[in-house]
Amino acid sequence: MSSVDQIVKTFAKLPEGERNAAVNAILAMMPPGPGPVRQIPEPVSQAPAPKKKVNGFMGFRSYYSPLFSQFPQKARSPFMTILWQHDPFHNEWDFMCSVYSSIRNYLEQSNAQREKKITLQYWLHFAVPVMGVLGRENYLPTLGWDLVTMPNGTIDLMRIAMPLFRKNLQPMNGLCLFTKCQEGGLQVDNQHLVIAKLSDPSYDMIWFNKRPHYQQRHAVQADSSELGVSALFPRNHAVAAEADDVATLQLPHWMQQGDFGTESGYSPQFETLLGSILENGNATSNDSYNMALAMDVPMMGFNGGA
């Protein structure tokens, strides 16, 4: 076998990248001819495909799933779905995950050489307290959830209480969330790139904690089977039965009618008491009632807050 045949066979067995390098090396040894020497282009590495955007439920599940670590995944998934359906922090989760999605590549590249990578769960460890979202250890008891053993021996997730819960947050954008996470201990090597990204107006995801008008807020509560309007009134008050009727009316009804209790069929006592509660959180009597639903003050916990 000639040397040329041997070279050709060896060349044919080389990977594509090494073939290009071998051809360029051979061409470099050739004497210059009348025309330009043709170079074989190096293979161009493809840019990594953009990663899927993380939505609020993905973040919620990542953060709270360890609450049920004793169960197999088959049992955990229904629990997480139930909790998400009743979670009061959907806007906050969507916001935290939107910010993470926009800077995800920078965060993953930043600490590539460190033992502690900035994963979604690690990011949420810092973002959750900044946003005022309930921590993992307090979530179930604060919102009235418990794991209950059923008569057949299975364990089910049940809501055994309906605590009143208030949240009071300040307006925040993505850059503000990131800097507050850094103040809380988040370490990012290439923070200048993240700051530049979040400072770009096209990526400035604003999350407003806008207070709704009192009529709008209580209209939503009236449309919720979990927050009946009767919760606004003093216990055992004479107009409580009328309040139960209010809770059965749909939201469009209130948007058309305007103020609560102004339509015919409700007693003057009902109108006076409800109007007073919605305006300033004060009933006309000295009886106690759930002020957390009627006042714009930060409250958290059971029965109007602690």
Curated annotation (Swiss-Prot):
- Cleaved signal peptide residues: none
Q: Does the keyword Transcription apply?
A: yes
Please give the family membership noted in the entry.
Belongs to the MATALPHA1 family.
Looking up InterPro entries in the UniProt record yields: MATalpha_HMGbox
Gene Ontology MF: a single term: DNA binding, bending
What is the recorded name of this protein? Mating type protein SmtA-1
Q: Which GO terms describe its cellular component?
A: nucleus
Give the principal location in a single coarse category. Answer: nucleus
A GO biological process held by the record = positive regulation of mating-type specific transcription, DNA-templated
